[in-house]
């Protein structure tokens, strides 16, 4: 056997904003944020990828068609693309939504726990119901509420257990967005 040269592995730099290689950031909807991150974290790579483009854009912004300097060009903020606006709206909507965990009393001493709002975070409610049923060895189903939203109904009083389960299994749901609603019905005095 002749001496074989083993090729070295290439090191790929991934963007912290969109999690793609930095060469592909332009295909994601967050190019402006990706450029800002790359410029602050890896200025040499930023100059290699976007250095000439930024210079030409700066020249276009500072000089208008007649060649005179435009004072408003520097003051105007860069407009977000439709994709970036859509992504920001979805993120804001997702962060504003809440997951409600509520226990409802049924006949005699039986209780059911309902979980609403998981679908706002991109979690499939049927799969979540199946996971809850397996975890707590109880019945769980997906039903539609009066306002046409999915809710998971789990048999048993499992408020805090489900709270911990959601934090453990579904990392995309922040702890601040999970709310346990206590059912405080006054019982009849006998």
Swiss-Prot record:
Q: Which GO terms describe its cellular component?
A: cytosol
Name the predominant localization.
Answer: cytoplasm
| Localisation | Cytoplasm
Query: Which SUPFAM superfamilies does the record associate with it?
Result: eIF1-like
What does the UniProt keyword field contain?
Answer: Cytoplasm
**Which GO terms are recorded in the biological process aspect for this UniProt protein?**
formation of translation preinitiation complex; translation reinitiation
Which residues does the UniProt record annotate as the domain SUI1?
A: 99-170
Give the start-end ranges of region Disordered.
63-83
Q: Under the GO molecular function aspect, what terms does this record hold?
A: translation initiation factor activity
Q: What CDD domains does the record point to?
A: DENR_C
Q: Which InterPro entries match?
A: DENR/SUI1_TIF (IPR050318), DENR_C (IPR046447), DENR_eukaryotes (IPR005873), DENR_N (IPR048517), SUI1 (IPR001950), SUI1_dom_sf (IPR036877)
Domain comment, in the record's words? The SUI1 domain may be involved in RNA binding.
Give the record's family classification.
Belongs to the DENR family.
**Subunit-structure text:** Interacts with the 40S ribosomal subunit.
> Which protein is depicted?
Translation machinery-associated protein 22
């Amino acid at each position: 056997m002749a001496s074989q040269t083993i090729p070295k592995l290439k090191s790929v730099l991934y963007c912290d904003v969109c999690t793609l290689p930095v060469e592909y950031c332009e295909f994601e909807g967050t190019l402006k944020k990706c450029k800002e991150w790359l410029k602050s974290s890896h200025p040499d790579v930023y100059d290699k990828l976007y250095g000439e483009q930024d210079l030409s854009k700066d020249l276009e912004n500072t000089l208008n068609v007649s060649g005179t300097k435009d004072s408003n060009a520097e003051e105007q903020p860069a407009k977000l693309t439709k994709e970036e606006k859509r992504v920001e709206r979805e993120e804001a909507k997702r962060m504003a939504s809440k997951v409600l965990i509520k226990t409802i009393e049924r006949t005699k001493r039986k209780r059911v726990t309902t979980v609403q709002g998981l679908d706002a975070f991109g979690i499939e409610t049927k799969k979540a119901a199946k996971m809850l049923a397996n975890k707590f060895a109880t019945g769980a189903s997906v039903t539609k509420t009066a306002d046409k939203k999915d809710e998971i109904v789990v048999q048993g009083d499992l408020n805090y257990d489900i709270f911990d389960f959601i934090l453990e299994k579904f990392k995309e749901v922040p702890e601040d967005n999970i709310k346990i609603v206590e059912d405080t019905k006054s019982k009849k005095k006998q």
